[in-house]
């Protein structure tokens, strides 16, 4: 990552990674790999140095400080090249050793780079200053980055954990460990800050929580200030040390959004509340309150602002330079507000804190002449009592005179001052601890939300390892916790990692890193360990700290290597024992441990607390359980009952839960390092840091990372992600197993195939290889995208070029035309043509102008209209767009809901499958357990028999002891003059008797008894030795006593082993039980979540049911409106019948009036015809109305059914489309993310290209340097050739080899130049060739170094040869002068010379080997280049395939976009049609109401006519004149009659016209109705397209209905107005009637008219009677149908209610069944669990038996082997003796030979050279024989020693086998007891299961009955519905 990319980190960049300039400087820095080393140093551990010389296995070097030191060669360690300076991951170092790690950390720390990767974990060093590396800019830069993509940081660790959680769907944990003051708390806060920020990015919409106090992420962050105020304090090493441990779990939803959080705390240091060391202080909250930042607090708490006024908090320092208590108080108070604490809760906490300060000031004194305490002043007590809501006198009385329970009564007990002070401190500590725990619980309640949570990330911040001058019980608990965490780290890093390799079948040799801390852990927590002994001592009333110390020393001193006796130093606190922890040796002081562990309280004061008026204090102690055991006489304090639980036991329980939680997660480790003890920024204390690195296992973690396979991927995931590297290796359409596909793919890649291994399910990679594959993948994607971009740019360029060509052609045509015009424009005829041409067209032009003006006018009008239309359409478009947006939002919401529902459904299905599989597995295990239970029962009986035998043995031992006692008494009678030692012997024997009884009572005292018996035996032995001369009889008794002691010792050891094994197995079983309980709880939680989701789905279904019911209610409203129309029609029928009745009355009156004329008869006939016509019209209208109503009812029913079906279909189609949409959306997101990654990879590759060019330049310069060095070597070789003498032939051969090496180097240099040119030409392959260039450069450096070594060796060889030549010359001269005397020296010189020649030959061979290796390197590079070219071609092919896929995807996307637009247009058209239908319906209703109004008008006219007839009748009756008189005026009346007749005809014409209007209105009504039906049919068809908007359409219909209602009201208003007009017309008509009456005074002319009228009336009466009969029949039929319909509705409602009741009963029964089923399932699971435990015990018993058998066989074999080895030893001893004799003989022979040699020398002086040579040959032969004999002798001695060791090993193995046999036998006894307990539990579980099964069957029976009742009710409902439909059908047919 270059500087430009680091710009994203802002001002933090220099503190995270070194700059590009610094990296270049490091690469060019001079460095000598052979001379630059590290040497050890007493003060600094290691220092850098330069080697000056090497001599005799020692090295002389000059340190960087100028000091010259000489050290052994094996103590010298090489430095890494400068390019590795400040490396970010120390696993990448070339030379991995302690000084390399130390100096890398030191150099990074000097540049303020405090974070460094160390293999799989991160190391951070406390900077002791603020660094700008935690701001929001840095958080954003690290979000979503891989570990290799960003510098080391705590944010990177956090983001990796977050990504692992989402991808692996596994809970994560981050363990931040280190010593106190190393920076754990700060890093924990940064982790929480990071998670809160990235979770808030995905959840910004949730601004405020239900509390209204702040967002969830704010609350999580603000929990820290509150916890730190009450739980952090200043210590010697840390100003803000956490004095409690916390495990913060941050829960996330399935999508990674923040869901909730919770905090678990461990081991608050209560003692700090009342006591602090000098350099420390109390918890921060005390000093924050006293800072006077909030003066109202001081007034409320009745305190001053001086800390020294309060004893509890002023024992150490009171201020800290780095902490502003005033600002911290405001931060704490603000944190309480954000966390939702009420004012009352905050004030209560402040009051209790102030009360504790006043508590420390309460003083007490002794009463005069009494050992009784009394208060020394009550002021402080009054203040404390006031703040705590207590009575001051009661508080003081409870402290000084507490009430204790003795038997069944309470008595008052006196207390001395020391006891009262202790009780006061204990109460203060208890109040503070419980208040702290309450605060944590309150914070957890705030952080707990109702949001669904899927996974969590736990952050562990626990008190670091502590080594103080004074270490007490709290330090032991803290250090024990850190020991367990370090063991967890070691086990995870070094054991589980290697076990994973074994499990996957990878060839791996197990490496023991020596990091096992189990011995120290067992010493603390196992039975008879420190905590076990402490708890045991707490049970005994008279136990003290010293008895606890004595037991510790008796059990562990000398027996455990981790337990030591301390060295007390003057000036330091006393220490009682020492423990060797992983971080160092700690001296512990045990004063007060028993009290701290029991933690007793004054119960009288606690009872006052329970009754306090301060609610918080009373709630804190509401659940306190006191001491119920009565006090016996002579005993000081009461013992706790069965509920007693010590602090150590509680801590171990919490610690075991924590470790269980951590084991269930994927851990990430952060190691915090403290750089110095003085808190100085930038200073590294080398010894201190090295000690922490060694303890933390940093080097071992790096080694396992480098040697092992830290990265692993499942085969399927690997194939999916990396197939792009070589798609041809895994064909697309062919099925290939994932593992085979991965093997083919990796085999086809150009990588080191030794860097990965194939397991059974995963492929494993060494460190760095996975990163290389990622780089190759990024490069491949970059090439593909580059190709796509090139093709796209090519297409665009070709399109632009085509446009340019077309433009050019157009320009050429224009130019040609202009040139032609310019050639003819001056031609006279052309000028004439130009002048005449306009004149010819002037007339036409004028016409055209006129037409154009008209056209312009029209267009202008059209434009105005179109503008108006456009504006109208724009307004409509705006409204439609708004509606569309609303619909889209609604659709999006529905899609989101549907997606969530589908996701929940899938999760439920998966969980169901998993649970079913687990149920099946547990069932099988239960069956196996039952079988094994029977077998174990039989074995249990056998073991009980063995136990009875053991009891008999114990009885025999008791008898033996009784005999010993008798003999002891007899001895006492015989020997009266025993000394004081004999008296001591008597006391020891008495103790032995008591201890024997104690052994029978309790096996827990076995170990103490054993020690006592050993002391007794020793004393007895001493007494026996002293008194052996005086008491011979006592000797026999003592021997018997020894035998008894041995028997007891064996029995005790056996019992002790039994006890230990039993306790261990119990603890293991408890752990297993806890794990299974937690699993059950987890499964219960998952089941509850599933039930909640099911309830949500049911709620959604109920909502849909409500919507359907609303639609049905709407339909019923429409039916009611239709019924109203029917009632209106019935009213019309009633009016018609009334009219008929009135006509009948008129006809009767006319008949009474008498005769009728012919004119009247004709008029009657005419009116009768008119009435018949009107009746037929009315009947037709009635039939039409009935038919219309029937059709409407049928249409309505059909439409309702079709709408229901369409709604169902639409729901299914909607689900399908939403699913497809989500799939395409996911694909689009994937493609988008891939494009972004490809673009980023391209940018990275371009930057890498520039870097590679720089590296090429460096490589070129280095190659030139290499060439110069080769030339220098060639010149040196020429010089050496001139200097060599006699060895010229050999040297020539060597020089030829050297020249060959030189040529190879030159050739290699030339190849490098070629490679450089190829790199320049092949830009696309730069990334791959970069690795080759780096390796080549490294090889070149190594070759140059090797060449220098060869040159030096060669120069040394030449010097040796020249020296040898001189020596040869000297020896030649000396031999000539004195050959015989110097023969031996000459031989030695020859040997030396031969040795040197041999060394030279070996050097030459080494040079040859290096040359061959260079040749191999060259070939390898050529092969890599060829492979890279193949990769390039493959990448091109993959790019083409990807381009094709991209085009296909674009097509699919375009199709879906088109479908979406079509659906939108269809939606708009359907909305328009709906609006048009609503307007048509409104018009239709208006027309219908107008027809009703016309009908009313006709009725009124008819009524007026009837009144006119009645007036005429009255006039006829009143006229008593004679007919003669009437005849006179007949003529006048006839004239008037004609006028009236014409008027009547006009009225009839108007009546006919109105009837025509009615008919036309009826026809229009029918047409509109038909049109409406047609459009409704079309609407039904289009409802398929408007599926998502049916609810909106219903709303629009509701709106239109409201509009219709308003229009109907308007029509009624118009109707009333018309009725008023009609009344006025009626008045006018009455006036006309009066005129007619005056004209009708002459009745004669009207008699004929009356007769006609009478006839017509008769006909009308008859017709009216017929109509009345028909109407009566129809009304009766209608009434019957109406009654039946009402009865059917009542029946339907009754059945509906019964059905609902049945369904409710069914639901309740189902719930009961489900509850019983869950109970039964839990019982079955318990049963299976017990069966699994039984099977495990069975297997353990079988394994134990098998191990016993194996041990017996091994013992037998060892005995035989021992016998054989003894025989071999004897043989070897004989051989050795023989060889010794031969050696002596050979020595004698050598002496003889030496004597003969002397004689030979004398003869040589005389005899010459031949005799000397013979003697020398003989001497050499003898020397060879002597050496061979000595070798054989040495080998025989080695064999003898080896045999002795083998015998010892076999003896030891036999002893171990015997011990194992005894231990296994004890284990069998123990397991038998466990089997019995499990059998009992299994029987109980089986009984409970049977009970639940019977309940289940009962409920199942009730459920069946309820279902039967529901079926019966449903069948009745169906029958009634069918009957209702039949009746309705019959009624319609009859009508």
UniProtKB/Swiss-Prot annotation:
- Regions of biased composition (Basic and acidic residues) lie at 1923-1935
- N6,N6,N6-trimethyllysine PTM positions read 129
- The IQ domain extends over 781-810
Q: Where is this region: Disordered?
A: 1907-1935
Q: Which UniProt keywords apply?
A: Actin-binding, ATP-binding, Calmodulin-binding, Coiled coil, Cytoplasm, Methylation, Motor protein, Muscle protein, Myosin, Nucleotide-binding, Phosphoprotein, Thick filament
Q: Name one GO cellular component term.
A: myosin filament
The disulfides recorded in the entry are none
InterPro entries from the UniProt entry: Kinesin_motor_dom_sf, Myosin_head_motor_dom-like, Myosin_N, Myosin_S1_N, Myosin_tail, P-loop_NTPase, XRCC4-like_C
Q: Which residues form the Myosin motor domain?
A: 85-778
Q: What is any one GO biological process for this UniProt entry?
A: adult heart development
Which residues in this protein are found as Phosphotyrosine? Answer: 1308
Coiled coil start-end? 839-1935
Domain called Myosin N-terminal SH3-like: residue spans: 32-81
UniProt cross-references to Pfam families, sorted A to Z: Myosin_head, Myosin_N, Myosin_tail_1
Which residues are recorded as binding ATP? 178-185
The subunit structure is:
Muscle myosin is a hexameric protein that consists of 2 heavy chain subunits (MHC), 2 alkali light chain subunits (MLC) and 2 regulatory light chain subunits (MLC-2). Interacts with ECPAS. Interacts (via C-terminus) with LRRC39.
For domains, the record's comment is: Limited proteolysis of myosin heavy chain produces 1 light meromyosin (LMM) and 1 heavy meromyosin (HMM). HMM can be further cleaved into 2 globular subfragments (S1) and 1 rod-shaped subfragment (S2).
Q: What else is known?
A: The cardiac alpha isoform is a 'fast' ATPase myosin, while the beta isoform is a 'slow' ATPase.
Give the protein's function: Myosins are actin-based motor molecules with ATPase activity essential for muscle contraction. Forms regular bipolar thick filaments that, together with actin thin filaments, constitute the fundamental contractile unit of skeletal and cardiac muscle.
What is the protein's name according to its record?
Myosin-7
């Amino acid at each position: 990552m270059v500087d430009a990319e680091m710009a994203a980190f802002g001002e933090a960049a220099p503190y995270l990674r070194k700059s590009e300039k610094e990296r270049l400087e490091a690469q060019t820095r001079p460095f000598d790999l052979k001379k630059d080393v590290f040497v050890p140093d007493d003060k600094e551990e290691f220092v850098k140095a330069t080697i000056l010389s090497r001599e005799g296995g020692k090295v002389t070097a000059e340190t960087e400080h100028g000091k010259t030191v000489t050290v052994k060669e094996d103590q010298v360690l090489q430095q890494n090249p400068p390019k590795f300076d400040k490396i970010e991951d120390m696993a990448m170092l070339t030379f991995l050793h302690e000084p390399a790690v130390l100096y890398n950390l030191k150099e990074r720390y000097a540049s303020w780079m405090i974070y460094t990767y160390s293999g799989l974990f991160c190391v951070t060093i406390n900077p002791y200053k603020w660094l700008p590396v935690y701001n929001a800019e840095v958080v954003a830069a690290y979000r979503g980055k891989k570990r290799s993509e960003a510098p080391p940081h705590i944010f990177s660790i956090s983001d990796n954990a977050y990504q692992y959680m989402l991808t692996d769907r596994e809970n994560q944990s981050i363990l931040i460990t280190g010593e106190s003051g190393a920076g754990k708390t700060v890093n924990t806060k940064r982790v929480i800050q990071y998670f809160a920020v990235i979770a808030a990015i995905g959840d910004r919409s949730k601004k405020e929580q239900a509390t209204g106090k702040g967002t969830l992420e704010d609350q999580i962050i603000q929990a820290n200030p509150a916890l730190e105020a009450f739980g952090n304090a200043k210590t010697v090493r840390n100003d803000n040390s956490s004095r409690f441990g916390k495990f913060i779990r941050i829960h996330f939803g399935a999508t990674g959004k923040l869901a909730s959080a919770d905090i678990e705390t461990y081991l608050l240091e209560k003692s700090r509340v009342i006591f602090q060391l000098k350099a420390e202080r109390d918890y921060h909250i005390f000093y924050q309150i006293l800072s006077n930042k909030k003066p109202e607090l001081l007034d409320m708490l009745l305190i001053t602002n001086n800390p020294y006024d309060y004893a509890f908090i002023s024992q150490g320092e009171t201020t800290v330079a780095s902490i502003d208590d005033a600002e911290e108080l405001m931060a704490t108070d603000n944190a309480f507000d954000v966390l939702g604490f009420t004012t009352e809760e905050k004030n209560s906490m402040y009051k209790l804190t102030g009360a504790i300060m006043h508590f420390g000031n309460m003083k007490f004194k002794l009463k005069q002449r009494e050992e009784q305490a009394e208060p020394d002043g009550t002021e402080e007590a009054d203040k404390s009592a006031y703040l705590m809501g207590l009575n001051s006198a009661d508080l003081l009385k409870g402290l000084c005179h507490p009430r204790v329970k003795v038997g069944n009564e309470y008595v008052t007990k006196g207390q001395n001052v020391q006891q009262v002070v202790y009780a006061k401190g204990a109460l203060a500590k208890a109040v503070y601890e419980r208040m702290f725990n309450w605060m944590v619980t309150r914070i957890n309640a705030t952080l707990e939300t109702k949001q669904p949570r899927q996974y969590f990330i736990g952050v562990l911040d626990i008190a670091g390892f502590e080594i103080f001058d004074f270490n007490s019980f709290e330090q032991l608990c803290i250090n024990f916790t850190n020991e367990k965490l370090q063991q967890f780290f070691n086990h995870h890093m070094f054991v589980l990692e290697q076990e994973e390799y074994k499990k996957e079948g990878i060839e791996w040799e197990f490496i023991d890193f020596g990091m096992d801390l189990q011995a120290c852990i067992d010493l603390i927590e196992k039975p008879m360990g420190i905590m076990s002994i402490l708890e045991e001592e707490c049970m005994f009333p008279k136990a003290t700290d010293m008895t606890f110390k004595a037991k510790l020393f008796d059990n562990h001193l000398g027996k455990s290597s981790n337990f030591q006796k301390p060295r007390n130093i003057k000036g330091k606190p006393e220490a009682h024992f020492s423990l060797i922890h992983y971080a160092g040796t700690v001296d512990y002081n045990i004063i007060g441990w028993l009290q701290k562990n029991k933690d007793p309280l004054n119960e009288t004061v606690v009872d006052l607390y329970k009754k306090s008026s301060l609610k918080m204090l009373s709630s804190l102690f509401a659940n306190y359980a006191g001491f119920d055991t009565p006090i016996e006489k002579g005993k000081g304090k009461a013992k706790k009952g069965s509920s007693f639980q010590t602090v150590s036991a509680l801590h171990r329980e919490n610690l075991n839960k924590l470790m269980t939680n951590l084991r269930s997660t994927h851990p990430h480790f952060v190691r915090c390092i403290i750089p110095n003890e003085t808190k100085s920024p930038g200073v590294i204390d080398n010894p201190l840091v090295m000690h922490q690195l060694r303890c933390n296992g940093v080097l071992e973690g790096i080694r396992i990372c480098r040697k092992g396979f830290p990265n692993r991927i499942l085969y399927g995931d690997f194939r999916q992600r990396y197939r792009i590297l070589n798609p041809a290796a895994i064909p697309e359409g062919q099925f290939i197993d994932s593992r085979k596909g991965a093997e083919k793919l990796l085999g086809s890649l150009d990588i080191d195939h030794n860097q990965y291994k194939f397991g059974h399910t995963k492929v494993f990679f060494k460190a760095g290889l996975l990163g290389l594959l990622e780089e190759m993948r990024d490069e491949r994607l970059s090439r593909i995208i580059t190709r796509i971009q090139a093709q796209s740019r090519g297409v665009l360029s070709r399109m632009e070029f085509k446009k340019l060509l077309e433009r050019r052609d157009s320009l050429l045509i224009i130019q040609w035309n202009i040139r032609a015009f310019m050639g003819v424009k001056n031609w006279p005829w052309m000028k004439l043509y130009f002048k005449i041409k306009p004149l010819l067209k002037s007339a036409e032009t004028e016409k055209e102008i006129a037409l154009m003006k008209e056209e312009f006018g029209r267009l202008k009008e059209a434009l105005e209209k179109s503008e108006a239309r456009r504006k109208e359409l724009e307004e409509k478009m705006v409204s439609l767009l708004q509606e569309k947006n609303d619909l889209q939002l609604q659709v999006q919401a529905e899609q989101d809901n549907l997606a969530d529902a589908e996701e929940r459904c899938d999760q439920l299905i998966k969980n169901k499958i998993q649970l079913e599989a687990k149920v099946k597995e547990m069932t099988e295990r239960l069956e196996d357990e039952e079988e094994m239970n029977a077998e174990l029962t039989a074995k249990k009986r056998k073991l009980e028999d063995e136990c009875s035998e053991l009891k008999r043995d114990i009885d025999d031992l008791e008898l033996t002891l009784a005999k010993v006692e008798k003999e002891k008494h007899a001895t006492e009678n015989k020997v009266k003059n025993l000394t004081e030692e004999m008296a001591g012997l008597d006391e020891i024997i008495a103790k032995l008797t008591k201890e024997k009884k104690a052994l029978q009572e309790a096996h827990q005292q076995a170990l103490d008894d054993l020690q006592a018996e050993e002391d007794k035996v020793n004393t007895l032995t001493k007494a026996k030795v002293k008194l052996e001369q005086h008491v011979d009889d006592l000797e026999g008794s003592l021997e018997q006593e020894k035998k008894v002691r041995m028997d007891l010792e064996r029995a005790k050891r056996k019992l002790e082993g039994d006890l230990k094994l039993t306790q261990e197995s119990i603890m293991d079983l408890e752990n297993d039980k806890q794990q299974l309980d937690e699993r059950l709880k987890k499964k219960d939680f998952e089941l509850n979540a599933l039930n909640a989701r099911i309830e949500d789905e049911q709620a959604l279904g109920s909502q849909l049911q409500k919507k359907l019911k609303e639609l049905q209610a709407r339909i019923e409203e429409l039916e009611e409106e239709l019924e109203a129309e029917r009632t209106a029609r019935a009213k019309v029928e009633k009016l018609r019948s009334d009219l008929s009745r009135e006509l009948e009355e008129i006809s009767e009156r006319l008949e009474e009036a008498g005769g009728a004329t012919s004119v009247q008869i004709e008029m009657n006939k005419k009116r009768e015809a008119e009435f018949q016509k009107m009746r037929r019209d009315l009947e037709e209208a009635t039939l039409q109305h009935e038919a219309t109503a029937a059709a409407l009812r049928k249409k309505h029913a059909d439409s309702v059914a079709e709408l229901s079906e369409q709604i169902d279909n639409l729901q299914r189609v909607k689900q399908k489309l939403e699913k497809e949409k989500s799939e395409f959306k996911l694909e689009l997101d994937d493609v988008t993310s891939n494009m972004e990654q490809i673009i980023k990879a391209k940018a990275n590759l371009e930057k890498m290209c520039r870097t590679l060019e720089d590296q090429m330049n460096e490589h070129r310069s280095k190659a030139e340097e290499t060439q110069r060095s080769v030339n220098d070597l060639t010149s040196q070789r020429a010089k050496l050739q001139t200097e060599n003498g006699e060895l010229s032939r050999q040297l020539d051969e060597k020089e030829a080899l050297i020249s060959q090496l030189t040529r190879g180097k030159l050739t290699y240099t030339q190849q490098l130049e070629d490679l450089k040119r190829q790199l320049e030409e092949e830009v696309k392959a730069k990334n791959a060739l970069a690795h080759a260039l780096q390796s080549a450069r490294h090889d070149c450096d190594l070759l140059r170094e090797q060449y220098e070594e060869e040159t030096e060796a060669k120069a040394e060889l030449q010097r040796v040869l020249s020296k040898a030549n001189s020596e040869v010359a000297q020896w030649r001269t000396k031999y000539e002068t004195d050959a015989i005397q110097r023969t031996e020296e000459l031989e030695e010189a020859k040997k030396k010379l031969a040795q040197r020649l041999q060394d030279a030959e070996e050097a030459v061979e080494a040079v040859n080997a290096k040359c061959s290796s260079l040749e191999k390197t060259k070939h390898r590079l050529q092969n890599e280049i060829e492979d890279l070219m193949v990769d390039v071609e493959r990448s091109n092919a993959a790019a083409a395939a990807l381009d094709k896929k991209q085009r296909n995807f674009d097509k699919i996307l375009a199709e879906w976009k088109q479908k979406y637009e079509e659906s939108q247009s269809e939606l708009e058209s359907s909305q328009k049609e709906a609006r048009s239908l609503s307007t048509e319906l409104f018009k239709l209703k208006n027309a219908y109401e107008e027809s009703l109004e016309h009908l009313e008008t006709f009725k009124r006219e008819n009524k007026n006519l009837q009144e006119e007839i009645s007036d005429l009748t009255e006039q006829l009756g009143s006229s008593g004149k004679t007919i003669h008189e009437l005849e006179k005026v007949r003529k006048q009346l006839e004239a008037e009659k004609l006028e009236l007749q014409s008027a009547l005809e006009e009225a009839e014409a108007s009546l006919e016209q109105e009837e025509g209007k009615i008919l036309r209105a009826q026809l229009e009504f029918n047409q509109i109705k038909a049109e409406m039906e047609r459009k409704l049919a079309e609407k039904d068809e289009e409802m398929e397209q408007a599926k998502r908007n049916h609810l909106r359409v219903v709303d629009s219909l509701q709106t239109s209905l409201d509009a219709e209602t308003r229009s109907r009201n308007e029509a009624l208003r118009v109707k009333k107005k018309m009725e008023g007009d009609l009344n006025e017309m009626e008045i006018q008509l009455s006036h006309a009637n009066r005129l007619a009456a005056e004209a009708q005074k002459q009745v004669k002319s009207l008699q004929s008219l009356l007769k006609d009228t009478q006839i017509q009336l008769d006909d009308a009466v008859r017709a009216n009677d017929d109509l009345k009969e028909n109407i009566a029949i129809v009304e009766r039929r209608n009434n019957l149908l109406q009654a039946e319909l009402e009865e059917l509705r009542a029946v339907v409602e009754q059945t509906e209610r019964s059905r609902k009741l049945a369904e409710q009963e069914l639901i309740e029964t189902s719930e009961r069944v489900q509850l019983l089923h869950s109970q039964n399932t839990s019982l079955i699971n318990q049963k299976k669990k017990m069966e699994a435990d039984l099977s495990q015990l069975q297997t353990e018993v079988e394994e134990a038996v098998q191990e016993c058998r194996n041990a017996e066989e091994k013992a037998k074999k060892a005995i035989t082997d021992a016998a054989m080895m003894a025989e071999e030893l004897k043989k070897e001893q004989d051989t050795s003796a023989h060889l010794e004799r031969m050696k002596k003989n050979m020595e004698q022979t050598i002496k003889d030979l030496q004597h003969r040699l002397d004689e030979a020398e004398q003869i040589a002086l005389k005899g010459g050279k031949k005799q000397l040579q013979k003697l020398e040959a003989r001497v050499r032969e003898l020397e060879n024989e002597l050496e061979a004999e000595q070798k054989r002798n040495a080998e025989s001695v080695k064999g003898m020693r080896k045999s002795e060791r083998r015998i010892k090993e076999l003896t030891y193995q036999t002893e171990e086998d015997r011990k194992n046999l005894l231990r296994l036998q004890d284990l069998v006894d123990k397991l038998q007891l466990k089997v019995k307990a499990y059998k009992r539990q299994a029987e109980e579980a089986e009984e409970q299961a049977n009970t639940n099964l019977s309940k289940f069957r009962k409920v199942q029976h009730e459920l069946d009955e309820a279902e039967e009742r529901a079926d019966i009710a449903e069948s009745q409902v169906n029958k009634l519905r069918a009957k209702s439909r039949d009746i309705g059908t019959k009624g319609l047919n009859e009508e």
